Amino acid sequence: MVFKKTQPSPSLKNPERIQSFKKLSKKIGIKFSKIEYYNTAFIHSSYKNENPEILEDNERLEFLGDSVLGLVAARSLFQKYPKASEGELSRIKSKIVSTPILNSIAEKLNLGEYLLLGKGEKNSQGKGRRKIAANLFESLVGAIYLDRGFEVAEKFIVQHLLEFAENPDMEESVRDYKTQLQEYSQKHFKTLPVYRMKGESGPDHSKMFQVSVRIRDQWEASGYGASKKIAEQNAAKELYIRIRRGF
């Protein structure tokens, strides 16, 4: 994520700062009632530490946003995948609220443009920068929740998080558990895993596939995904982890 180098004053009396939030409001399609929430959402703790006049940073909003994200993700997945087990739902949830996903959405929305960041943090790279961006998305969710309520926050999350996470283009980022399972099965069981399509559900534009994988009659697991490929990967992951753990 690219963070703005020349940053305006955090004061809401500053025309440039106010204009930036009008731009953000239009971009995400949400009318801001209390801009002060969003102002705080985009003040990093490092900026507050370097500017004693700043009374609050975005960490509390980040905490709140993380909780709202978790609830929305859990409820949405519970409703969308009625046949998925608790373990499967937990794995899907952990993926879609992970730092890489939140960072990708923050970059897509260019949230770094609005962030007030300390001089030291501006030079952060790699995981540190991705974590800042992911936390920024959470603090924005917290601000939306306080300002507009749960329903508006939920709509924003579903639009920018859950749909993004189910994008088939993300298949390339899925760890190749099929290959790992195949290699392990050949080495220890002298046979190949067998995949079987178990079913599909949902409308045409948002299909959910279920695939099972079996090694002989000894090991079997199922996986779900927005495509057959992802479902196979998730099934392979489930079985591979079970085998390695011995159950």
Curated annotation (Swiss-Prot):
GO cellular component: cytoplasm
Binding residues for Mg(2+): E62, N135, E138
Cross-referenced CDD domains: DSRM_RNAse_III_family, RIBOc
Main location: cytoplasm
Cofactor: Mg(2+)
Record domain DRBM: where: 176-245
Entry's localization field: Cytoplasm
EC number: 3.1.26.3
Reactions catalysed, as given in the entry: Endonucleolytic cleavage to 5'-phosphomonoester
SUPFAM superfamilies, A to Z: dsRNA-binding domain-like, RNase III domain-like
GO biological-process terms attached to the record: mRNA processing; regulation of gene expression; rRNA processing; tRNA processing
Pfam families documented for this protein: dsrm, Ribonucleas_3_3
Start and end residues of each RNase III domain: 21-149
Root EC class: hydrolase
GO terms for MF: double-stranded RNA binding; metal ion binding; ribonuclease III activity; rRNA binding
Family as reported in the entry's similarity comment: Belongs to the ribonuclease III family.
Function: Digests double-stranded RNA. Involved in the processing of primary rRNA transcript to yield the immediate precursors to the large and small rRNAs (23S and 16S). Processes some mRNAs, and tRNAs when they are encoded in the rRNA operon. Processes pre-crRNA and tracrRNA of type II CRISPR loci if present in the organism.
Record's subunit section: Homodimer.
Protein name (record): Ribonuclease 3
Organism: Leptospira borgpetersenii serovar Hardjo-bovis (strain L550)
